[in-house]
């Protein structure tokens, strides 16, 4: 553990602990991906690149929509790394992603606090350079 590291904001419950029990501890990245989605694959590959660049990059955890789940091995092959993942049904997936939001969903949490929520492929789309600036400002 790096002692001088910012302990971050006061811990809160993000509402995502049903997927990962430790999601509200420290810095975490939770992704809402669809196995066959090209933009999701690109986002995963970008996150892998950031993890290679920074030893202390937040842990990345994925929630996949249960659609074309046979494509998950190919998804990780493309990303260059297998991240921890859960597969959930279509309706709960969209409910958790949130109303009006689209995939890929990339959520940056610090002690459960929502710091950044990227979604879709338009102006709120995931951008690894922007995330890098948010984490390593």
What are the functions of these language-model segments?
Residues 38-42, 53, 136:
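C-terminal luminal/periplasmic domains and tails of membrane-associated envelope-modifying transferases
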Residues 1-21:
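N-terminal "domain-start" segment that seeds a small globular fold
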Residues 19-41, 59:
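Short active-site neighborhood of thiol/selenol oxidoreductases, capturing the structured segment around
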Residues 43-77:
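Structural microenvironment flanking redox-active thiols in thiol-disulfide oxidoreductases
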Residues 97-137:
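Non-catalytic, surface beta->alpha helical segment in thiol-disulfide oxidoreductase systems
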């Amino acid at each position: 553990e790096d002692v001088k590291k910012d302990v971050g904001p006061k811990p809160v419950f993000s509402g995502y602990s049903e997927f990962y029990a430790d999601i509200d501890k420290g810095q975490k990245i939770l992704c809402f991906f669809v196995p066959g989605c090209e933009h999701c694959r690109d986002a995963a590959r970008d996150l892998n690149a950031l993890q290679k660049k920074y030893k202390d990059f937040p842990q990345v955890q994925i929630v996949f929509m249960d659609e074309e789940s046979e494509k998950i091995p190919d998804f990780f092959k493309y990303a260059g790394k297998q991240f921890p993942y859960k597969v959930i049904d279509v309706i709960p997936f969209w409910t958790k992603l949130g109303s009006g939001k689209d995939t890929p969903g990339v959520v940056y949490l610090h002690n459960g606090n929502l710091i950044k929520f990227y979604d879709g492929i338009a102006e709120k789309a995931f951008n690894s350079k922007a995330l890098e600036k948010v984490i390593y400002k």
